[in-house]
Amino acid sequence: MSDNELTERLLSGDRRALARVISKIESEDPEASDIISELYPHTGTALSVGFTGPPGVGKSSVIAKLIELYREEDKKVGVVSVDPSSPFTKGAILGDRIRLTEHFLDPGVFVRSMGSRGHLGGLAGGSQLAGLAMEAYGVDVVVYETMGVGQGEVEVASAADTVVLVLQPGTGDSVQALKAGVMEIADIFCINKSDHPQADGAAHEVRQILDIGEELESQPWFPPILMTRGDTGEGIQELKETIEKHRAHLEESGELEKRRRAAQRELVISWATVRLEREMQERLDREDTELMERVYNRELDPISASEEIFKEV
């Protein structure tokens, strides 16, 4: 199938075409660039929500219940779920099938797991492009779910319009999230497993941390703290409504355009960096016996060597 045909099929709502395009993105297939170029004008209208937080807090269960509510409104949903990568295959270990299984047969839901491929951020390198492909395919909502790697979670902010930080009572997650800098990017706090005896205490702890931040208090949007149960769906309707309120706030304040401009800038920098790193690696592989030998023999320092490589890139 040609790239043009693949693009046309995706834009017409072909699920198999979407799956193939995302595979090309994830494998960094050279053809992916031309495809994204054709799809990009068809993006930018979907609601995008990022879910982040430590492993085991129930992000997937919350997302699954949220999807149910969107589907009741006949909205199409795309989910990009980033899993830890196998060190051998660089593929997603956990996979789609373990989570969100109830939505697999729903034609209005497209779930894709992507391996982190050693990426330092919480999101895989191609996850934002996968989200763009889903938008072009026609989803109304794109959900990004991170794997919970600590400080790198801040990358989710550049991919989503609204960031939901999911925490669990009785684990000290909020303190760890604060240390990692994740608290600063959250637009909504979600205390999941709210039937836990320490749920109210966890919410109070988050509130105390937020009250300390003077910068947050001065912002027009102060992050609300919601209580949910991913297993029963309790509190998910309120979460959905709060996400929509935040989207309305972003649009009315002009912040949505600012966020998206920043996100586009970061995406350009990210992929320029990936390409530059690849070209430099190829150059080193070609000239290892020459350039690197001089470095090994202390005839050339690493900084000067890198400058020589840059001259050729």
Predicted regions and their residues:
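Short acidic active-site motifs
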Residues: G152, L178, G235
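Nucleotide-state-sensitive switch-loop elements of NTP-binding domains
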Residues: S2-V49, V57, L66-G152, A159-V166, ...
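P-loop (Walker A) phosphate-binding loop of NTP-binding proteins
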Residues: P54
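Canonical P-loop GTPase G-domain recognition
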Residues: I188, S194-H249
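Long, well-ordered amphipathic alpha-helical subdomains in the mid-to-C-terminal portions
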Residues: M227, E238-V313
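Conserved beta-strand segments of the P-loop GTPase G domain that flank and frequently precede/overlap
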Residues: S113-M114, L165-Q168, C190-K193, M227-T228
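Hydrophobic positions on the alpha1 helix immediately C-terminal to the Walker A/P-loop
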Residues: V62
